[in-house]
Amino acid sequence: MDYREFFSQFRHLSEKPGIGGKIKILPEDFVVIEDPLPQIFEGRKHAIFLLKKRNWDTMAVIKEIAKRAGISHRDIGFAGTKDRHAVTYQYISVPAGAKEKVESIQIRDVELRFVSYGRFIKLGHLLGNRFRIIIRDVEGSAFDRTKEIIRELREKGGFPNYFGYQRFGERRVVNHLIGKLLLQGEFDEAARLFLGYADGSMEGDEARRNFWETEDVDRALEEFPRFLRYERTLLYTYKKTGSWKKAFLSLPLPIMRIFIHAYQSYLFNLYLSRRIEELPLNEPLVGDIVVQVKGGIPYRDRTYRVTETNLNFVREKVKRGEAMVSGPLFGFAMRRAKGIPGELEEEILEGEGITLDAFKKLPKPMAEPGRRRELLIRPIGLTYGYLPETGMCFRFFLPKGVYATSVLREIMKDH
């Protein structure tokens, strides 16, 4: 199953036909520019560089920079991963003593420019990202159809804030399934799926199929390609300890948490799709949890419940763009909705056979407290136009954690 088939279960909010087309035919068709938090420029212990990369995975280029600078990749800070098949600009921090070495580094399709001294950049140290995206292979009527879709979505309050396909895997759409197995304590089945699932189109698939059939760890270590380093880490640790649980805990923390995050994202997408079918997204109901919004940026840690008493007040705040209705990123400490929205949340959990306690019973590094996430996206500064012999060009800003591909999905209707 590829991501298109996977996403067919999630409803579109727009009912108008999409424009079709293709993205990322060229890396230059998808440009991402990070807007950092101003606080990263406070201090003198780290050197801040602007990293421009083309067709590079974020972690891969970070490790290459670290290798050439003679430092650990853990000493390089960055606010978030960016698309690989794109041209992206983001800020990274390195120890101040490594500034000159980093300035001298030359890597193909990578540029590094010293900006300032500051502090270590952590994940989440950004306001959001600016995008310039071209959709190719569209008809001349694409502009008018885009205009109709955007008008419809503005009337409905925005674009649905689905987690994009990057969260689940583009071809091996199994991250969320692995996450569910981990929540259920099925570490052996989670390992079998992570190591053995093959879609038939990727290097290493034959080795994966062999493991699926035999579960022979020694053979897998011989056959798995070196670039499947996390799979090999899992295999090595299992061989050493005889425990798939310990094997998962040996993975780097960001990789270890990908699976639980993917399952949380899947549950959120299920909730959002059901809400599109059954309940309003831009009209708060009694029992809803809303998040505060300032300058178009949602503050997900600032929430309050809708009650009979404050219902009209909250509705006005939502209309003015000062608050947004939220959905659940399930976790052991997440603030639950009540009323009809709360019943829908409970139905999602019951349908999956999962309780919130399961998120707490995970091994400590994997345990997830959960939080709220706004149901709608309102791209800031959205402009678009048709370029003859090229396609549709879009420019907009999105807050952190929001996916440009989810905006494009409503316009293209390609998945």
UniProtKB/Swiss-Prot annotation:
Pfam families: TruD (PF01142). It catalyses: uridine(13) in tRNA = pseudouridine(13) in tRNA. The active site is at D83. GO terms for biological process: tRNA pseudouridine synthesis. The keyword DNA-binding does not apply. Transmembrane segments: none annotated. Residues 158-378 form the TRUD domain. Keywords: Isomerase, tRNA processing. It is an enzyme of class 5 (isomerase). The keyword Chloroplast does not apply. It comes from the Archaea. PROSITE patterns: TRUD, UPF0024. One of its GO terms (molecular function) is RNA binding. Its EC number is 5.4.99.27. Belongs to the pseudouridine synthase TruD family. Could be responsible for synthesis of pseudouridine from uracil-13 in transfer RNAs. PANTHER family: PSEUDOURIDYLATE SYNTHASE PUS7L (PTHR13326:SF21), TRNA PSEUDOURIDINE SYNTHASE D (PTHR13326). This is Probable tRNA pseudouridine synthase D. It comes from Thermococcus gammatolerans (strain DSM 15229 / JCM 11827 / EJ3). The lineage of its organism: Archaea, Methanobacteriati, Methanobacteriota, Thermococci, Thermococcales. The gene is truD.
